UniProtKB/Swiss-Prot annotation:
Keywords: Coiled coil, Membrane, Nucleus, Phosphoprotein, Repeat. It comes from the Eukaryota. Residues 10-28, 861-871 have a biased composition (Polar residues). InterPro entries: CRWN. GO terms for biological process: nucleus organization; regulation of nucleus size. Residues 849-859, 1095-1105 have a biased composition (Basic and acidic residues). A motif (Nuclear localization signal 1) lies at residues 379-386. Expressed at low levels in roots, leaves, flowers and flower stalks. Core component of the LINC complex which is composed of inner nuclear membrane SUN domain-containing proteins coupled to outer nuclear membrane WIP and WIT proteins. The LINC complex also involves nucleoskeletal proteins CRWN/LINC and possibly KAKU4 and the cytoskeletal myosin KAKU1. Interacts with SUN1 and SUN2. Binds to KAKU4. Residues 73-714 form a coiled coil. The keyword Methyltransferase does not apply. This is Protein CROWDED NUCLEI 1. GO terms for cellular component: chromatin; mitochondrion; nuclear envelope; nuclear lamina; nuclear membrane; nuclear periphery; nucleoplasm; nucleus.
Amino acid sequence: MSTPLKVWQRWSTPTKATNPDSNGSSHGTGLDMVTPVSGRVSEIQFDDPRILPEKISELEKELFEYQHSMGLLLIEKKEWSSQYEALQQAFEEVNECLKQERNAHLIAIADVEKREEGLRKALGIEKQCALDLEKALKELRAENAEIKFTADSKLTEANALVRSVEEKSLEVEAKLRAVDAKLAEVSRKSSDVERKAKEVEARESSLQRERFSYIAEREADEATLSKQREDLREWERKLQEGEERVAKSQMIVKQREDRANESDKIIKQKGKELEEAQKKIDAANLAVKKLEDDVSSRIKDLALREQETDVLKKSIETKARELQALQEKLEAREKMAVQQLVDEHQAKLDSTQREFELEMEQKRKSIDDSLKSKVAEVEKREAEWKHMEEKVAKREQALDRKLEKHKEKENDFDLRLKGISGREKALKSEEKALETEKKKLLEDKEIILNLKALVEKVSGENQAQLSEINKEKDELRVTEEERSEYLRLQTELKEQIEKCRSQQELLQKEAEDLKAQRESFEKEWEELDERKAKIGNELKNITDQKEKLERHIHLEEERLKKEKQAANENMERELETLEVAKASFAETMEYERSMLSKKAESERSQLLHDIEMRKRKLESDMQTILEEKERELQAKKKLFEEEREKELSNINYLRDVARREMMDMQNERQRIEKEKLEVDSSKNHLEEQQTEIRKDVDDLVALTKKLKEQREQFISERSRFLSSMESNRNCSRCGELLSELVLPEIDNLEMPNMSKLANILDNEAPRQEMRDISPTAAGLGLPVTGGKVSWFRKCTSKMLKLSPIKMTEPSVTWNLADQEPQSTEQANVGGPSTTVQAATTYSFDVQKAESETGTKEVEVTNVNSDGDQSDINSKAQEVAADSLSNLDVDGQSRMKGKGKARTRRTRSVKDVVDDAKALYGESINLYEPNDSTENVDDSTKASTGETGRSDKAISKNGRKRGRVGSLRTCTTEQDGNESDGKSDSVTGGAHQRKRRQKVASEQQGEVVGQRYNLRRPRRVTGEPALSKKNEDIGGVQQEEGIHCTQATATASVGVAVSDNGVSTNVVQHEATADSEDTDAGSPKRTDESEAMSEDVNKTPLRADSDGEDDESDAEHPGKVSIGKKLWTFLTT
């Protein structure tokens, strides 16, 4: 809301003062007003009193306009304060949003840590798998040793077979020798043979027959043997088919292993992602370190600024010792508020830390459970592998047995060679599987490292974001009123940073442990590679041995074939010899034939029986082995499919979870960036407002300099007035009265040290900069008093005695119509001194602008030109921010002191007019000591008529009536201080006024404090005496300028007033300025006079002395005001 302001445009540009009491100092030229005034106080002549009422009425109108603008400014102040509260609410909402996002970040960090723990468990499982593989390698070595042993045993068996063949050849040779002996006997008996040739020929025919029969039987035997060979070949085919089935099952197993390898590759990819995350976390840690460096640099800058503020504080403390009590109270309140905020912040931090620790523990437990489950699965797999290996060993044993049974035959050798080749293929496949498993383990290790890197990176980024958010909060909260809170928050930030560092150290330690584990794992893999190389060498040795065995077997086969051929040749030879010796050996051959046939049949039957038994056993063994293998394969297939489905489901679930988490993290980052932009924009807006406020403050400082020059001009006018009085002393009628008048010397009232004020105003800019840091210190650091009680302090003590309605607090609930008759009634009793005092209103506002710190901008802006109206709104905002704390304590006294100089001045003008008429045309009675109520009645009648007009002029704004009323009552107080020319009849009216105003004092003390105090009330006003005591403590800075200016005004025209500010007696005797101000009718005046004397003698101001200023009306005869003396002079 920007309301138009009515600016006071009557005074002209002041000239340079030439008063000898002003210490010869001059300040700023000031801004020119719009319209100059032709007449001034120095030009007032007593021979033309008709001009005085007009000028006084003009001045009063200008005061009305000034007060109206003041009310508008206060309304604008209230609106700015409401806007400030709205901004504070928005800022709190932003802080709540930041807290929620921080919690979300903590949850994301917990999830990432859970993943990290799961990956660690997977690493443990993989290590266990590596150990299992080592065990499997050991078992393979044992199997190789067993194979070597079996090969050696088979070689020994082959050697035994060779030896048996050699023994048989020896037996054949023995038989040949026996045949040679028989041939010798045949030769011997050749004669007998010749003899019996005929018998031999006869027998020869019979032998031929028998031979043919033997050949037939031999052919039948060969047919049976061929059938047996075919049966053996079919059995071998069946064995080959079984082996092919086993090979197919092995292929299926390999396919499943390939699928498992693919899943392992996926896990390795995840490990790589974790490593990338780790890299990101390291980068985030570097950013956090940079931010910590920035924070340390900012802390150093703050320390330098604090040193500067300490220097300024020392200079201010020398000037503001009297305000220490107020400072202590404010500091205590600030400490309480800061302590509460710090406690709340600490509680929030503790709660967040506890939640974080609980989440971490839960995640660790879940990861441990998952690791245990994975370990159990690995153990199951190991048991299955062991079972498979046992079955394979059993199969190998069965094959070994079969090979041992067929050692005597060539087909048995071929079967053994095929079995050896199959086992070699199986070994090669197992080696390939080991290599693939090794690759999978390496990939899994890389995936785990990548996941760990990701987790660390995410945690680092979250920590960096948290630190940035905290820093932004601290920067927003670093104001001048909350410096101590900011320092405490900095200490808490340091603690949090230390905690983060400890956490980072723990993470680094964990990373180092993982690196050590990785190195140990790599060492183990190197050992496995060495073992694998050894195994390969052993396999090469085995293959060499196998090749040697094959060569040896081939040689043996060739040797056996040669032996068979030789044996056949020998048999043919024997047959030929037998044919030659048929006749001789007919009988022996028949006997031997019969014996051989029997033996051959027995051996044949035994061989057939053995072959059939072996066939049955082999078939039954093969069927059982095949059934067992089929069952095992089916069970393995089911288990493998189940495991495959589980692993695929787990992989899909992990992918979905990872995608969701990535989306959530991206959304959170976008939100944080948006909020950062909003916070930056708000911060820039606040900085722009601060710069505008500083510009306005500079303008106000210039205006204060201008007002000082006007005050010096007013002092020069006072000197002219005194010169005019001295010229009138030559008059016969006026000389006697003026000779009796004793004017108080202006030298007794020390003028303000303008050089000090200039220094204070020159230091206004650095104090404005300090206000950005601590408005409380800046508000307390602008007093005008020095180490001693200066001229301002004396003026304060003087004006506290001059206010007749100081202890009474007019109620804001009064209507303007009710207030105006009272003010006019009191104004009609005023004397001629008001004509001079009315011209001092401007200096009243000047001194109040110089002395007050919280409200000086509001007091001065009303005298600014039309061109400065645009700056007033911005100034009112700063005043609302700086003066809210002061309004809680001394808002009542300030409101009373602002506006007590208006309506009474109007009333005193009428009295001056009446007195002028009486001077020239009417005979007026002299002073009478008794009270007369007639003058009071006349004055009240005159005031009521004028009140109606003023009510009509002011009641246009209903909202401003309460404030205007309070300002008018304050105005009447100062007019009471200035209207000293009343007769004795005025005393009764003054007493009645005081009684009426004391009745409503308690109500107004509470309402006025709440009218323009835009903060929540922190205390409740009590009795009038207690409220005045708080005024004297908290509102010293505001009251001081008001009373000082009033004292200056009265001193400038030579007016000496009593403690109550109301003249009740006119004494035509010589006045003693050093006497005490006492009232013969009231004993309470003794205390008040003591307080007055203490203030004059530069002693501290007491609150109790001000509480009783309005209790009496009498004045000491030796200190009668110049107004009263002028009144007696005019009436005589």
